Amino acid sequence: MKKTIIILLLYFLNLSSAYSIEPDVFVQSTVNRASEILSKDISKEEKINQLKVIAKETVDIRGVGFYSIGSARKNLNEDQKNKYLEVFEDYFLKSFSSRLSEYSNPKIDVQDKDVLNKNYTIVRSILVATPDRPEIKIDWRIYTKNPDNPLI
């Protein structure tokens, strides 16, 4: 009986890792979702709201916020940290979504990935050039500590 339980446990652990999403697939899926929203015939306000949803699901806003504040974080008490994170999230989502909503049907192609360690992978992509803008290289730092829920 003990052997059966161990075998089942190992099977399910292996099965769960089989369903984890690869960082390059995660990035391509995320940019495809954003591109779909940007190509819809909806108001700019609705595009912004839908882009904010994607950002909340895929970006480690808390991590970006603490990275942005740097060592000053050590001088804040818990209430100040919470207030800062609240203000930073509002700023980040507003800035991110309003700037991105200016693009009309952007095409981003994932090129390759570089696994830095078990927690981070760099995914390289390009924003395809149009007559109005040059090609832009974009590197995404993907936090992969939880492979079932990678974050930008």
Residue spans for each PLM region:
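Sec-dependent N-terminal signal peptides
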Residues: 4-16
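A broad, structure-centric signal for solvent-exposed, well-ordered loop/edge residues
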Residues: 7-8, 45, 115-120, 134, ...
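Early exported N-terminus immediately downstream of N-terminal targeting peptides
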Residues: 22-100
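Surface-exposed, charged secondary-structure patches
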Residues: 94-139
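Short beta-strand edge/turn micro-motifs at domain boundaries
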Residues: 135-152
